[in-house]
């Protein structure tokens, strides 16, 4: 009995008219389009993310960034590592160049500062040296001039005494001569401080025959 009952049900279902199928299809709701489903899903995701962000902000909890899943491709990993190394080396090179430029500028600035200080010290030393030389020259000139004045005064005193002595001992010489046929008559009178002196002499002249 039990085995015969499902057969009768299946037979009855098979013998249903096709009109019932059309009615059932018309009564079912139409399926939504895929674009509408995507738009609705995006809106739901946005709303969910906004709600989560607002909740995090209110609660003060900072969400940690999700870690990216590891890449299984070794070639991509090598390229990424090479590119990161290139970027790091480039940044280090730029930093080293900036440091080198700053150090070069500071060395030039320090050299100029030292040069200006050395020049100022040299000028100060030359001024002091020149002032000392001028003072020494003035002192030497004053000493030499004083010595010269002393010698000049001594010479004037000696000359005055000598002139006085020569004036007291000064004499005059006067005389006359007379020439005859064979003689030269000479008579001199010398006046000295002590007294007059008269010299007379006859000089014979040689006569050729």
UniProtKB/Swiss-Prot annotation:
PROSITE patterns from the UniProt entry: IQ
Chain's role: Involved in sperm capacitation and acrosome reaction.
Subunit and partners: Interacts with calmodulin.
GO MF annotations, alphabetized: calmodulin binding
Any single GO CC term annotated in Swiss-Prot or TrEMBL for this entry: acrosomal vesicle
Major location (coarse): cytoplasm
One Gene Ontology biological process: positive regulation of flagellated sperm motility involved in capacitation
PANTHER family referenced in this protein's UniProt entry, alphabetically: IQ DOMAIN-CONTAINING PROTEIN F1, IQ MOTIF CONTAINING F
Name the record gives this protein: IQ domain-containing protein F1
Domain IQ: 72-101, 128-157
Biased composition range(s): Basic and acidic residues: 1-19
Keyword field: Cytoplasmic vesicle, Repeat
Keyword Transit peptide attached: no
Compartments reported by the entry: Cytoplasmic vesicle, Secretory vesicle, Acrosome
Lineage: Eukaryota, Metazoa, Chordata, Craniata, Vertebrata
Region (Disordered): 1-73
């Amino acid at each position: 009995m039990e085995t015969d009952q499902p057969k009768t049900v299946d037979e009855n279902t098979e013998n249903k008219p096709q009109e019932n199928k059309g009615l059932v299809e018309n009564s079912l709701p139409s399926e939504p389009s895929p674009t509408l489903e995507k738009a609705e899903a995006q809106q739901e995701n946005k709303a969910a993310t906004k709600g989560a962000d607002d909740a995090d902000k209110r609660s003060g909890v900072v969400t940690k960034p999700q870690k990216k899943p590891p890449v299984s491709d070794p070639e991509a990993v090598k390229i990424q590592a090479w590119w990161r190394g290139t970027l790091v080396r480039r940044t280090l090179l730029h930093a080293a160049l900036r440091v080198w430029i700053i150090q070069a500028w500071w060395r030039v600035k320090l050299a100029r500062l030292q040069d200006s200080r050395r020049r100022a010290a040299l000028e100060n030393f030359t001024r002091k040296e020149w002032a000392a030389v001028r003072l020494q020259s003035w002192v030497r000139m004053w000493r030499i001039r004083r010595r010269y004045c002393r010698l000049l005064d001594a010479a004037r005193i000696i000359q005055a005494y000598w002139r006085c002595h020569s004036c007291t001992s000064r004499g005059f010489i006067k005389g006359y001569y007379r020439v005859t046929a064979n003689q030269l008559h000479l008579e001199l009178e010398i006046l000295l401080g002590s007294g007059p002196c008269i010299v007379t002499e006859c000089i014979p002249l040689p006569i050729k025959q």
